Each structure stands twice: as C-alpha cells, then as structure tokens.
C-alpha cells in the first residue's frame, strides 16, 4: 500500500474515533419541536429563553402561565427519569399529529410513552398560554428568585 494512502486511512480512523466521543444530537428535542408546531402557533425558538423555566434549567417562581408550562414539563421529565434508564432528552418516541391533535402511540408505562406524554402536555399547554414578549430573554438572576 502506498504510504500516502496509509496516512489518509490512519487520519480517517483517528477522526472516527474522535467523533465517537461527540454526544449525539438530541432527537427527542427535534420531536418536541415538531409537537409544539403541531399543537400551537409560536415557533419553538420563541420558548427557548422564555421566563424562568423555558430552556435549560429553571428556578424561582414561574412568571406566567407559559412559564408554568415549562416548569411542569421540567418536573415531568424529572419523573420520567425515575423509570430505570430513561433519559428524556435523548429518548425518541412514536406519536401522530393531526393538527392540533397529538397522540402518543408507544406502550403505556414505557420510557418512550412517559417522555412523549410530557412533551404532548407541554405542547398543548404552550398553545393555550398567552405569550408575553416581555418575558423573553429576561435576566434570570434578577427575575427568577
């Protein structure tokens, strides 16, 4: 084998080994985004930095009904984690969307069904809650105590 080809092959193998340590993209969050779009009117990015609980983490008192939806979703994921090896952010599930109706179709009691039920409830809650633009991108350190 040509030494140049051997070096290229070695470089590809090393790259693949390095890529194996990169965490997978969360497919569940992609499904959650699709559920939100099926049930509601806002684009999912409108919720990422909303209030005290929408997006990563959450503390303090929810600012409004929509923020309470996010707090409830966080608690729902916490409960789903109690079922064995259930990691909600990475667990994919089966559901159907007939706008605006969402139906989770995995077996009841399974990790996938529990996570789907959490996302379904949140998507429906988001669709029913008013969106207060003043609560988007707030300083969580001062508003969420």
UniProtKB/Swiss-Prot annotation:
Give all cystine bridges in this chain.
38-97, 52-144, 54-70, 69-125, 76-118, 86-111, 104-116
UniProt GO molecular function: calcium ion binding; calcium-dependent phospholipase A2 activity; phospholipid binding; toxin activity
Enzyme Commission number? 3.1.1.4
User: Which residues does UniProt assign to the signal peptide?
Assistant: 1-27
Q: Which reaction does it catalyse?
A: a 1,2-diacyl-sn-glycero-3-phosphocholine + H2O = a 1-acyl-sn-glycero-3-phosphocholine + a fatty acid + H(+)
Q: Which PANTHER family match?
A: PHOSPHOLIPASE A2, PHOSPHOLIPASE A2 FAMILY MEMBER
> Which PROSITE patterns does the entry link to?
PA2_ASP, PA2_HIS
Catalytic residues, chain numbering: 73, 119
Cellular component terms per the entry's GO annotation = extracellular region
- Places the protein is found: Secreted
Q: Which domain of life is it from?
A: Eukaryota
State the organism named in the record: Bungarus fasciatus (Banded krait)
Instruction: List keywords of the entry alphabetically.
Output: Antibiotic, Antimicrobial, Blood coagulation cascade inhibiting toxin, Calcium, Disulfide bond, Hemostasis impairing toxin, Hydrolase, Lipid degradation, Lipid metabolism, Metal-binding, Secreted, Signal, Toxin
The record lists Ca(2+) as bound by 53, 55, 57, 74
Q: Name one GO biological process term.
A: lipid catabolic process
Its biological function?
Snake venom phospholipase A2 (PLA2) that inhibits blood coagulation and shows bactericidal activities against both Gram-negative and -positive bacteria (E.coli, MIC=0.4 uM and S.aureus, MIC=0.1 uM). PLA2 catalyzes the calcium-dependent hydrolysis of the 2-acyl groups in 3-sn-phosphoglycerides.
Tissues of expression: Expressed by the venom gland.
Query: Which enzyme type, at the first EC level?
Result: hydrolase
Q: Which cofactor does it need?
A: Ca(2+)
Quaternary state and interactors:
Homodimer; disulfide-linked.
What does the similarity note say?
Belongs to the phospholipase A2 family. Group I subfamily. D49 sub-subfamily.
> Which Gene3D superfamilies does the record associate with it?
Phospholipase A2 domain
Kindly provide the name given to this protein in its UniProt entry. Answer: Basic phospholipase A2 BFPA
């Amino acid at each position: 084998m040509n030494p140049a080809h051997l070096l290229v092959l070695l470089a590809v193998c090393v790259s693949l080994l390095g890529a194996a340590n990169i965490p997978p993209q969360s497919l569940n969050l992609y499904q959650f985004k699709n559920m939100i779009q099926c049930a509601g009117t806002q684009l999912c990015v409108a919720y990422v930095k909303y209030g005290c609980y929408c997006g990563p983490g959450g503390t303090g008192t929810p600012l409004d009904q929509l923020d309470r939806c996010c707090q409830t979703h966080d608690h729902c994921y916490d409960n789903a984690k109690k079922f064995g090896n259930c990691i909600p952010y990475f667990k994919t599930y089966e559901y159907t969307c007939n706008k605006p109706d969402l139906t989770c179709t995995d077996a009841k009691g399974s990790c996938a069904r529990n996570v789907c039920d959490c996302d379904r409830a949140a998507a429906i809650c988001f669709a029913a809650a008013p969106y207060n633009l003043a609560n988007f991108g707030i300083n969580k350190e001062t508003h969420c105590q």
